[in-house]
């Protein structure tokens, strides 16, 4: 095993903002991305997205709803791509799991990985927030590992009573 991926830092204020968004979206999944200075390794801005899973405008499996999946709108995907050429690029894509579990599901892994299997679909890490009826249970951060050729968990965060 060689190099571990570098952890992009998320401070407590950013986590609190995302956790509140997860609560406001519950029982649906929330989604968006976190931006930071191109030269740094810390996110400072939350860019919330509308979960377009139920919009009927995306070619995903129809039995999935916004309670079990998320998808960015076309406009959000364009904005995400534009961010990579800016001074404040997206560094982490986040979404919530209303089942209370903070893990990168098989579907999450497929969506986050390049369709050619040669790395991540976007040059970002992933953050998954586990939320249930009563609280934010926890969240977990994942990064692409060149050594393992897949996303690996690199950090866990405590939940919150919201």
Indicate residue ranges for each PLM-predicted region.
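Single, functionally critical "micro-switch" positions that shape active/binding sites
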Residues: 96
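Conserved beta-strand-loop surface patch within small alpha/beta domains used
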Residues: 1-90, 99-162
């Amino acid at each position: 095993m060689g190099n571990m991926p570098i952890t992009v830092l998320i401070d407590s204020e950013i986590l609190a903002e995302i956790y509140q968004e997860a609560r406001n979206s519950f029982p649906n999944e929330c989604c968006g991305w976190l931006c930071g200075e191109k030269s740094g390794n810390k996110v400072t801005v939350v860019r919330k997205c509308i979960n377009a899973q139920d919009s009927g405008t995306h070619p995903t499996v129809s039995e999935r709803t916004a309670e079990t999946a998320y998808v960015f709108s076309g406009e959000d995907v364009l904005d995400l791509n534009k961010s990579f050429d800016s001074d404040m690029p997206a560094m982490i894509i986040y979404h919530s799991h209303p089942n209370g579990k903070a893990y990168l599901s098989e579907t999450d892994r497929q969506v986050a990985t390049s369709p050619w299997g040669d790395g991540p679909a976007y040059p970002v890490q992933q953050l998954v927030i586990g939320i249930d009826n009563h609280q934010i249970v926890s969240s977990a951060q994942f990064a692409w590992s060149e050594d393992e050729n897949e996303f690996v968990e690199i950090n866990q965060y405590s939940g919150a009573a919201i």
